Amino acid sequence: MALLQISEPGMAPAPHQRRLAVGIDLGTTNSLVAAVRNSVPEVLPDEAGRALLPSVVRYLEKGGRRIGHEAKEQAATDPRNTIVSVKRFMGRGKAEVEGAANAPYEFVDAPGMVQIRTIDGVKSPVEVSAEILATLRYRAEDTLGDELVGAVITVPAYFDDAQRQATKDAARLAGLNVLRLLNEPTAAAIAYGLDNAAEGLYAVYDLGGGTFDLSILKLTKGVFEVLAAGGDSALGGDDFDHVLFGHVLAQAGIDAKALAPEDVRLLLDRVRVLKEALSSAPQASLDVTLSNGARLVQTISHDTFASLVEPLVQRTLTPTRKALRDAQVTPADIKGVVLVGGATRMPVIRDAVAKYFGQPPLVNLDPDQVVALGAAIQADLLAGNRGSGDDWLLLDVIPLSLGVETMGGLVEKIIPRNSTIPIARAQEFTTFKDGQTAMAIHVVQGERELVADCRSLARFELRGIPPMTAGAARIRVTYQVDADGLLSVFAREQHSGVEASVVVKPSYGLADDDIAKMLEDSFKTAEIDMRARALREAQVEAQRMIEATQAALSADGELLDDAERTQVDALVAALRTIAQGDDADAIETATKALADGTDEFAARRMDKSIKRALSGRRLDEI
């Protein structure tokens, strides 16, 4: 007999008229999804109660894949087809990731963003990220019981335009409507500020698996104003792993290049466990058997680890000092330092932050969850679910200056870094030669003075300029950055009115045709995805049915005679065996058989409960 499920008081889903939106922290190591439910932001766990989804995708033959925990478990045995830390490759070209430390992948030499060859074909970081985002989307829709109107996705504050566009492309591929790209430190400040009614100057120190950000924020009466942001989009907890990895190999006299890819991934996984153990113990041990039978046994002290990673710790303080200078404040002006990212659990980080700012950091919110919670608050607001206490304002900034190439390969900055967004700025330029009728406009991003040292974002031409003497034409170039930190550029010749514009699709972004092809490919694999999803749902329901039956037998097994008990036990055993297979229909059939086979038992339990409730009571009391 099927039983209806009723939620606890106050925990029922929000009313149907509420527009469902979520916050997603797309992390290097782990990703999370959160939503505001009953006016409280909360992280949404999977069916096993796990909040964190490992940012790992394993590709199989014939279009299959495993995502999250299942993929992570196979990373050491199938490293070439199991993509980890893909966030480090977002918006990056092959030349920029070629030296990726100990990466076991085969990078493909293709124009634009780096590609990775797998057993299921060549994949871009956008496609891999889309798999993770889609998994979080399904989790949210299953938990909330309806489709999402959109999501706020967090990105490192120091992500450039190419990396932001790649993130937005991944969301589009995953079927998500992006309400806003939100800087991770800002999201953390929202969660922390609203949770603690904080005011004053705060620093958000965000060290994740692959990126580092430091933001200075001013919180006053519901206004979150980012004064400055700095960071390093190629520095994170992974780098601490690689330093420890190198030390372990050096102590053992092993050349990393001589290791099989499987051993590299196995060692990196074990080294990460070792690093985490050193966060709570003065020393920790490593015991690994490699594929060739060689055994590595080492004990490393926390002091040794601290000295090994000291250069990385100092690398985080360099952009910290820069951000403080940009905000024109000193460490003494900072009221509190909020730690974000799992890597900030390392004592060596907490000690360095405390020493630099002269105060212990704030750690009352989970550093793994705080970004997703802040994004959920912003998503709920952008979806139109404004409630009491929601009259707050967010003022974010761009992390890197935007400029245009001028003669001689120089950069003229149009919008300086740390400008509040959204923003539009314009500047006039002129022609270089007599009779010049066209102008090439090269859009760049960065702080250096030479174009060669900055990132190229886009190129376009303004044609139809009336022929004039050099310096007579007036071309007004306008840069416009939206709330996501994405750029559009417009050029207009003032005399003739001729115009040209470009919505910046970075050199390492994806063309619309590429997105369309990926969407088409995703449709082709949709059946595989749905089968995998149906199988997982059937297995979860089977396990629920088995546990419910066993609990009932423990409580009221005496209601069955020996023959009936034997029959129920056989049905449970059959379902347990079938649930380990991959036939969803067979699992559903076996689950139904157990449900049908225990109908009479359920009825007897109900009768017993009623009799117990009525025992000793008179008719007129009922």
Curated annotation (Swiss-Prot):
Biological process, per Gene Ontology: iron-sulfur cluster assembly
UniProt xrefs under Pfam families: HSP70
Alphabetical UniProt keywords: ATP-binding, Chaperone, Nucleotide-binding
A molecular function GO annotation: ATP-dependent protein folding chaperone
HAMAP family recorded: HscA
Family: Belongs to the heat shock protein 70 family.
Entry function: Chaperone involved in the maturation of iron-sulfur cluster-containing proteins. Has a low intrinsic ATPase activity which is markedly stimulated by HscB.
Name of the molecule in the record: Chaperone protein HscA homolog
Annotated source species: Burkholderia ambifaria (strain MC40-6)
